[in-house]
Swiss-Prot record:
<keyword id="KW-0560">Oxidoreductase</keyword>
<dbReference type="Pfam" id="PF00171">
    <property type="entry name" value="Aldedh"/>
</dbReference>
<dbReference type="InterPro" id="IPR012134">
    <property type="entry name" value="Glu-5-SA_DH"/>
</dbReference>
<keyword id="KW-0028">Amino-acid biosynthesis</keyword>
<protein>
    <recommendedName>
        <fullName>Gamma-glutamyl phosphate reductase</fullName>
        <ecNumber>1.2.1.41</ecNumber>
    </recommendedName>
</protein>
<dbReference type="GO" id="GO:0055129">
    <property type="term" value="P:L-proline biosynthetic process"/>
</dbReference>
<dbReference type="InterPro" id="IPR000965">
    <property type="entry name" value="GPR_dom"/>
</dbReference>
<dbReference type="GO" id="GO:0005737">
    <property type="term" value="C:cytoplasm"/>
</dbReference>
<keyword id="KW-0963">Cytoplasm</keyword>
<comment type="similarity">
    <text>Belongs to the gamma-glutamyl phosphate reductase family.</text>
</comment>
<dbReference type="InterPro" id="IPR015590">
    <property type="entry name" value="Aldehyde_DH_dom"/>
</dbReference>
<dbReference type="InterPro" id="IPR016162">
    <property type="entry name" value="Ald_DH_N"/>
</dbReference>
<dbReference type="GO" id="GO:0050661">
    <property type="term" value="F:NADP binding"/>
</dbReference>
<keyword id="KW-0521">NADP</keyword>
<dbReference type="InterPro" id="IPR016163">
    <property type="entry name" value="Ald_DH_C"/>
</dbReference>
<keyword id="KW-0641">Proline biosynthesis</keyword>
<comment type="function">
    <text>Catalyzes the NADPH-dependent reduction of L-glutamate 5-phosphate into L-glutamate 5-semialdehyde and phosphate. The product spontaneously undergoes cyclization to form 1-pyrroline-5-carboxylate.</text>
</comment>
Length: 418
């Protein structure tokens, strides 16, 4: 048995005990883990500095370095995230339904842990603590396979988290980090279906598609975010400008950032210059269709869009701009190019708002609000394991309940089937 298989086998062996831990023990571990992160701040931040320096030497994108970087405030946020998870109600053991059959059988549906969760992710150290917290609270063992860019940071974080397990006499097989960074190990991990119940990829389109195509373990896709804001002909201009500015520039490197603007032709000539002036404060580049380019002619950072722009998740200070002649055309365009993540309409027309809500195919659909709210904390779920863009098992921000399954519990008094 090689090192990878042993990690997976140990988690599989521990899954029953972890799945039946008392809530008080789980909460104690999570609070201790939060304390340990802060106690290990020096070691974690020094490890992170090494990873960031390597990324900068390798000329990695600014958006990637932003996701990778930790400081005191971000580490404090990770610790607070664990404490918030500890405060959430424990879903494990919840009786979801109970009914008595005519033959006297009492059949109940009880929420249980999934078992062993595998997570493959890129340069997001906060995923390490969030994933542990959510999986542990729901009685799951978790095996993490982070990207090479964050390896030193992840090792330091996992060391601090594991101490909370061992100090509370809980098997440290509840949390494992695959430290090998080679692609062969990742490919082998994706095929450990005899031990791992579900695999969740967190990262860019390339990573997610690689996992979906090659894994033999069931996959929950946490998709890329080609998110749109459609500005309807009856939109409030100031509201639309503020929403788009927030959705794009508050944090560019996240999957719920807006990447594309769709504008009704009836207002485009008046609205687009106002929007341009606001986005110009952040040096946002606009890749425009022919009509939008004509309206913004002569302005800096305005270029012609290519066919690739409409489906692009930039994660950068770049947006595509499309002008349409109707809400139907807007919906058709968005459904054709979106990634089923988060889409928004800005409008004062109730009927158009309802049409957009009903016909847009996405996990999160907004009326008059920023797509940046697609987040477990903002939805009141606590931390999230990711935002699912698929329709089976989980969709949208994945909180605690998304990391559970259920079993049927049947009480009898000697019944036999005739």
């Amino acid at each position: 048995m090689n090192d990878l298989e042993k990690i997976c086998a140990d988690a599989y062996e521990a899954r029953v005990k972890i799945g039946t831990l008392d809530t008080d023990i789980k909460n104690k571990v999570l609070n201790d883990a939060a304390d340990n992160l802060l106690k290990a701040e020096k070691e974690i931040l020094e490890a992170n500095k090494r990873d960031v320096a390597t990324a900068e030497e390798n000329m990695k994108a600014k958006s990637m370095i932003d996701r990778l970087s930790l400081d005191h405030d971000r580490l404090l946020g990770m610790a607070d995230g664990l404490r918030q998870i500890a405060k959430l109600a424990d879903p494990i053991g919840e009786v979801m339904s109970m009914a008595k059959r005519p033959n006297g059988l009492i059949i109940g549906k009880r929420r249980v842990a999934i078992g062993v969760v595998g997570i493959i992710f890129e340069a997001r150290p906060n995923v390490t603590s969030d994933a542990f917290g959510l999986c542990f609270k729901t009685g799951n063992c978790v095996i993490l396979k982070g990207g090479s860019d964050a390896i030193n940071t992840n090792i330091a974080i996992v060391k601090a988290l594991k101490k909370a397990l061992t100090d509370n006499l809980v098997s440290d097989a509840a949390l494992a980090l695959i430290e090998s960074t080679d692609r062969e190990t990742t490919n082998a991990f994706m095929k450990m279906d005899q031990y791992v119940d579900v695999l969740i990829p967190r990262g860019g389109a390339g990573l997610i598609q690689n996992v979906v195509k090659n894994a033999t373990i069931p996959v929950i896709q946490t998709g890329t975010g080609n998110c749109h804001v459609y500005v309807d002909k009856d939109a409030d201009f100031d509201m639309a400008v503020n929403i788009i500015n927030n959705a794009k520039t508050q944090r560019i490197s996240v999957c719920n950032a807006c990447e594309s603007i769709v504008v009704h032709s009836a207002i485009a000539e008046e609205f687009l210059p106002k929007l341009y002036d606001k986005l110009r404060e952040h040096h946002v580049q606009l890749h425009c269709d022919e009509r939008a380019q004509a309206i913004l002619a002569g302005r800096d950072d305005v270029t012609e869009a290519t066919a690739d722009d409409w489906g692009m998740e930039y994660l950068d200070y770049i947006m595509s701009v499309k002008i349409v002649d109707s809400i139907d055309e807007a919906i058709e365009h968005i459904n054709r190019y979106n990634t089923s993540h988060s889409e928004a309409i800005v409008t004062n027309d109730y009927d158009n708002a309802q049409k957009f809500l009903n016909e847009i195919d996405a996990a999160c659909v907004y009326v008059n609000a920023s797509t940046r709210f697609s987040d477990g904390n903002e939805f009141g779920f606590g931390a999230e394991i990711g935002i699912s863009t698929q329709k089976l098992h989980a969709r949208g921000p994945m909180g605690l309940e998304a990391l559970t399954s259920y079993k049927y519990i049947i009480y009898g008094s000697g019944q036999i089937r005739e």
